């Protein structure tokens, strides 16, 4: 009963306005008030500051600086085997497994389609049909930078406007097509494991999504789909990443979805819905290796 009330209220909340206000406050240098907010947040959500490169609260002038805090060097070792992929973020596995034709599991009893997730891009959806997916939820206490599961060449980025529903387990289990209706940034990479997509999904109070190569993607929230394409490998302006390298960040946190083409990787057997993740640990193993190709347009 209480959960139903929470969901109904969430539909009614002015989520855009709340998110704008939260983003404004999170960037304010409000002195003692900022410190009070940071300490209260850390206490309520049991944030482990011992892992932070700057463990003292006083090191953070704004709430956003605290929220996107970096970790101590080498505290998240990245799997080094070239045939293995690394987890992209700290968090909890929401769902993972096979994309059954074009259906992804959101929560028990709830599915959504690849094409809806990819903003109606049928050509792109076909590449990942019958592939694998992993959805990772970043809770408020987690480290909120997102890293690369493997070496990759950036081919395309798509910004998709949308709702700003919370993406916690309660909403995932009760809001249909949650990840396909929320604001998101879709990043397509070419890798030695074939095409890979990494999606950063927005949510209520996520003030912004930033990428390593271009800075802030949202806001502004203009309500239109935007698309960027990037140069080929070896040409001026090409953007590539190494496994474990930071590629984006949330202010405040949300969800990361990874998509892999069929017959390329096998997800690690120890991972299941509810598994705790640490960036850099084992995500998957290669089924076959191939040289990066140029078959994505």
From Swiss-Prot:
UniProt pathway annotation: Phospholipid metabolism; phosphatidylethanolamine biosynthesis; phosphatidylethanolamine from CDP-diacylglycerol: step 2/2
Site residues (Cleavage (non-hydrolytic)), renumbered to this chain: 253-254
PTM sites of type Pyruvic acid (Ser): 254
Intrachain disulfide bonds: none
Protein origin, superkingdom: Bacteria
Cofactor(s) the record lists: pyruvate
EC number, UniProt record: 4.1.1.65
Reactions listed under catalytic activity: a 1,2-diacyl-sn-glycero-3-phospho-L-serine + H(+) = a 1,2-diacyl-sn-glycero-3-phosphoethanolamine + CO2
Active site: 90 (charge relay system), 147 (charge relay system), 254 (charge relay system), 254 (schiff-base intermediate with substrate)
PTM text: Is synthesized initially as an inactive proenzyme. Formation of the active enzyme involves a self-maturation process in which the active site pyruvoyl group is generated from an internal serine residue via an autocatalytic post-translational modification. Two non-identical subunits are generated from the proenzyme in this reaction, and the pyruvate is formed at the N-terminus of the alpha chain, which is derived from the carboxyl end of the proenzyme.
GO annotation terms (biological process): phosphatidylethanolamine biosynthetic process
Function field: Catalyzes the formation of phosphatidylethanolamine (PtdEtn) from phosphatidylserine (PtdSer).
Subunit and partners: Heterodimer of a large membrane-associated beta subunit and a small pyruvoyl-containing alpha subunit.
The name this protein goes by in its record: Phosphatidylserine decarboxylase proenzyme
Species whose genome carries this gene: Photorhabdus laumondii subsp. laumondii (strain DSM 15139 / CIP 105565 / TT01)
Gene of this entry: psd
